[in-house]
Amino acid sequence: MIDAILGNILWMVFIIIGGVLISWGVHFVPVGGAPAAMAQATGVGTGTVQLATGAGLTGLVSAGFMMNVTDNFPLIVASGAVGAMIMIAVTMIVGTWIYVYGVGCVPSSAKVKVDPITKYRQDLYVSQGTEGHGIPTVSFVSGVIGAALGGIGGSLIYYSLIEVGVSVGLERVGVTSAVTGNSLVAVAAIFAIGIFLVNAVIPSYNIGGTIEGFHDPKFKKWPKAVISSVVASILCAIVAVIAIAQLGGI
């Protein structure tokens, strides 16, 4: 057990880094919750965990698919990031269409007077009694950045767990079988999803409701969530490495 941990310190560090990136990335994602669903708050009308998990799982699937065709680490991580970015971008743009053409409101933020990216006035278009509505440009860009961080983090965790399985398998039988189709790939994926969910839930308590993106005052709370995620990711990494080692590796 101790040997398994000491022999996979590098991959455990990558798992922790991945968890931190996920936690940090969640703070970038514009989440409006139930108020946004009624066009009374800026962001996507769903919860923090649901939105972050959707992007993260898409990134994990993209990274897993890329591992079928290459073992190039940068390509695998980039694939995870792009997959997550596409998912969150499509979600936000479709949401914007509904807000604009369905509800009939202009995407605007109540947190800033001027959009930091487009420099367009925001306060003129915020309806009375609301905290903004739709997904303005700054929130869209922020969401794509957050998805990229989440995708990279999820890919790091998944890749690291696969490498742990491969290294344990090499030590036990002297030769490793193909990763594709191996039963422990499912175990690694489940652990990766679990670690992702843990690090997505922590920021949701930190945010405490809605957040518009990196321009939102709540974004400044991210260091607290990151510290908590480091601790949680260490525990998750230890459990995951021990479990995969005890199962015999890949």
From Swiss-Prot:
InterPro entries: MeTrfase_D (IPR005779). Belongs to the MtrD family. The keyword Methyltransferase applies. GO terms for molecular function: tetrahydromethanopterin S-methyltransferase activity. NCBIfam families: mtrD. The complex is composed of 8 subunits; MtrA, MtrB, MtrC, MtrD, MtrE, MtrF, MtrG and MtrH. Its EC number is 7.2.1.4. Pathway: One-carbon metabolism; methanogenesis from CO(2); methyl-coenzyme M from 5,10-methylene-5,6,7,8-tetrahydromethanopterin: step 2/2. Keywords: Cell membrane, Membrane, Methanogenesis, Methyltransferase, One-carbon metabolism, Transferase, Translocase, Transmembrane, Transmembrane helix. The keyword Metal-binding does not apply. This is Tetrahydromethanopterin S-methyltransferase subunit D. One of its GO terms (biological process) is one-carbon metabolic process. It is a multi-pass membrane protein. The chain crosses the membrane at residues 9-29, 47-67, 75-95, 138-158, 184-204, 225-245. The lineage of its organism: Archaea, Methanobacteriati, Methanobacteriota, Stenosarchaea group, Methanomicrobia.
